[in-house]
Each structure stands twice: as C-alpha cells, then as structure tokens.
Amino acid sequence: MSSSPRSPDARPLKVRVKSARTRSSSSQKWLQRQLNDPYVARAKREGWRSRAAFKLIEMDEKLHVLKRGMRIVDLGAAPGGWSQVAAKKIGAAEGQGKIVAIDLLEMDAVTGVMFAQMDFLDPTAPERLFAMLDGKADLVMSDMAANTTGHKKTDHLKIIALVELAADFARQVLAPGGAFIAKVFQGGTEGTLLADLKRDYAQVRHLKPAASRADSAELYLVATGFRGSADRTEDETDEA
C-alpha cells in the first residue's frame, strides 16, 4: 500500500471531455473532473476501488485507528474502497480480525471481508452483526453521504441526520474503547451531534484529508475511546 496520499504522481495532461447530446452539463463536468483527478488515476493503478481509499489511509496515518486483529463495521461500504484499506491494515486476509461491510447495494467481494446487504437501521441489524463478528465491534466507519439536492443548507441537514443515525448504531454495536469515523459537511449545525459524541467518546477530532476535493465541504469526524452505552444510559437517567 502506498502511504503518501499527499503526494500523488504528477498530474497528467488535462483531458477535455467532448460534449454529447445525451449527456447533461453536470454529468459532463463530473466525468471531466474524474478524468483529471490524480487520486482517481492512482486508485486505478494501485487497485483501490475508489479514490476514497486515500482518505482513510491518510486519517489512519495521522491517528493510527486501524490495528491488527480489530473487528470493524463499514457502513455504506460499496464499492468497497474503505473495506479494502481496513482489510489490509488489520490483516483480515491472514485471519487477523474481522470486517463486516454493510450496504443496501450489492458489492463485489473483498478478500477477508464479510458482506451483508441490508439496511443498518433494521432492528435486527445489531444482532446479525454480533453473530458475524463474534462480539461487538472495535470500529464503526461510515463514508455514507445522503443524496444531494443542490441546496447547501438542506444537504447539510440531511448528511447530519444520516451521521446521527450512524452514531446511534455505533453506540449499539461498539465495545468500550471503540472508535467511530464518519463523513460530515461543514455547515454550522453540528452542535448537538458534537455534544453527543463528546459525551460518548474520550476524544473527538475533525480532519479534512488531502484526497478530499478542495472545493468540497466534507470533513471527517474521528471519535475514539468509546465510553460504553451503559455509561450514556446512566448519564441520561441522572439528567432526567
């Protein structure tokens, strides 16, 4: 695994996409951006399924979240870039640790990774997960993003709502001392979410990896040192 997301190979000559009658302006811009993105090219060369792999690589280089033998849940895993990185880091192919990738969409198999095509909000999801992991998880990670509308405030609220659901799922399935990683967008309404995470975890940090596009408002929350769901229940009882 290459370990320097900040120094992709020199950018190739810029590719211009010829317009097509059946292609919308937005899809044409997306295609041109993909063709000229050094991380997209590098992901193809190195065998990663998506450029998002480099985001997790960089976060782990800074915070050392991924450790051999961990039990990991990858929410919204398709196409599998994060699962690939995690599997390599924890030694899943050699029988070290376990990873369960969860998505509503189908996903091609990743060596050392178990896949569950289901909704993580299904009430049976935690128990199914415990059976697959043989216990609680050490890390829940989510690179999920809600479908966007183009309205920044609305889109931000949608992604925060999705992160809150993922954080609630993490509370149910994490072992004490566990960690939670999730994508968010800058927007100024994360106060309640951050307060909850700071209550649930010993440390909460924000990161914007180099592989995140410069014009993107995305950030990643990395929460470590899960205090345990029992601790939160006691706190809520005291506040009542």
From Swiss-Prot:
InterPro entries: RNA_methyltr_RlmE, RNA_MeTrfase_FtsJ_dom, rRNA-MeTfrase_E, SAM-dependent_MTases_sf. It catalyses: uridine(2552) in 23S rRNA + S-adenosyl-L-methionine = 2'-O-methyluridine(2552) in 23S rRNA + S-adenosyl-L-homocysteine + H(+). The active site is at 183 (proton acceptor). It is found in: Cytoplasm. The lineage of its organism: Bacteria, Pseudomonadati, Pseudomonadota, Alphaproteobacteria, Hyphomicrobiales. It is an enzyme of class 2 (transferase). It comes from Azorhizobium caulinodans (strain ATCC 43989 / DSM 5975 / JCM 20966 / LMG 6465 / NBRC 14845 / NCIMB 13405 / ORS 571). One of its GO terms (cellular component) is cytoplasm. This is Ribosomal RNA large subunit methyltransferase E. Keywords: Cytoplasm, Methyltransferase, rRNA processing, S-adenosyl-L-methionine, Transferase. Belongs to the class I-like SAM-binding methyltransferase superfamily. RNA methyltransferase RlmE family. Its EC number is 2.1.1.166. The keyword Transferase applies. Residues 1-28 are annotated as: Disordered. Specifically methylates the uridine in position 2552 of 23S rRNA at the 2'-O position of the ribose in the fully assembled 50S ribosomal subunit. The keyword Metal-binding does not apply. GO terms for molecular function: rRNA (uridine-2'-O-)-methyltransferase activity.
